[in-house]
From Swiss-Prot:
Binds 1 Mg(2+) ion per subunit. It comes from Loxosceles amazonica (Recluse spider). This is Dermonecrotic toxin LamSicTox-alphaIV1iii. The lineage of its organism: Eukaryota, Metazoa, Ecdysozoa, Arthropoda, Chelicerata. It is an enzyme of class 4 (lyase). Its cofactor is Mg(2+). Disulfide bonds join C45-C51, C47-C192. Mg(2+) binds at E25, D27, D85. Expressed by the venom gland.
Length: 275
């Protein structure tokens, strides 16, 4: 999965897919009532990027729905996965549940079209703070109570704060998520800085073990050719990047073209892949 980083305006969906992304990451900010408000990152946001692109969440979700609904004039077949990077910093442990409930209701209305012919992309809820695990509980409960529990088949989970893996596993369990139940594990840092692959290797080892909790592992945010090669050699499932074309180029190199391929809609992002 080539994951386009910080896609916060609707026009950027086409921009990143045209560069080779089959997945995008979108930042979501919340108002004082725990309601998702904008697709917006703000500063700091990484090197060589403009941090202030934004849409109202409702508008972005409708644009995203069109881009992932077969038959729509804006449909992009390649776009199969969306990571919502949830900026929950202004939420408390007590309001996180409400935030998750309200966000699920928003997705149901504006992205899934009330459960009728909505967008088809898989969704990952990515939360930076393991103390906000109740966001996941609220999200799941809202879909169940609305009679759309079936949509949880399209939803995965990630804690992105580079916490201890056992602590993440515990937070997932508190949220009601079982081991390997659509769990993506991220590791990374802003593209301005270097980061070792130590925790990536630990997560990959967990993913590949008989008693791990991780379904897929992705690394963010990289674009240097050497770093991309190192990440692929570490056997990650996804790479988040500002330059999807760089990842495409590396995948076409002799060392990788027979080892990796781009994921398609037929590839289940929740299934453990073993060579």
């Amino acid at each position: 999965w080539i994951m386009g980083h910080m896609v916060n305006e609707i026009y950027q969906i086409d921009e990143f897919v045209d560069l080779g992304a089959n997945s995008i990451e979108t930042d979501i900010t919340f108002d004082d009532d725990a309601m998702a408000e904008y697709s917006y990152h703000g500063v700091p946001c990484g090197c060589m990027r403009w941090c202030h692109k934004w849409e109202y969440v409702n508008d972005f979700l409708e644009g995203l729905r069109r881009a992932t609904t077969p038959g729509d004039s804006k449909y992009r077949k390649q776009l199969i996965l969306v990571v919502f990077d949830l900026k929950t910093g202004d939420l408390s442990s007590s309001t996180a549940y409400k935030g998750g409930k309200l966000f699920a209701e928003k997705l149901l209305r504006y992205y899934w079209n009330g459960g009728s012919n909505g967008g088809r992309a898989y969704i990952i809820i990515s939360i930076p703070d393991i103390d906000h695990y109740a966001f996941i509980s609220g999200f799941r409960d809202a879909l169940k109570k609305s009679g759309h529990e079936d949509l949880l088949a399209k939803v995965g989970y990630d804690f992105s704060g580079n916490d201890d893996l056992n602590s993440i596993r515990s937070a997932l369990h508190k949220a009601g998520v079982k081991d390997r139940e659509h769990v993506w594990q991220s590791d990374g840092i802003t593209n301005c800085l270097l980061r070792s692959l130590d925790r990536v290797n630990e997560a990959v080892k967990n993913r590949d073990s008989s008693n791990g909790y991780i379904s897929k592992m992705y690394y963010w945010t990289i674009e240097k050719y050497a770093t991309v090669r190192d990440a692929l050699n570490a056997e990650v499932d996804g790479i988040m990047t500002n330059y999807p074309d760089v990842i495409v180029n590396v995948l076409n190199e002799d060392s990788f073209k027979n080892r990796f391929r781009m994921a398609t809609f037929d590839d289940n992002p929740w299934e453990l892949f073993k060579r």
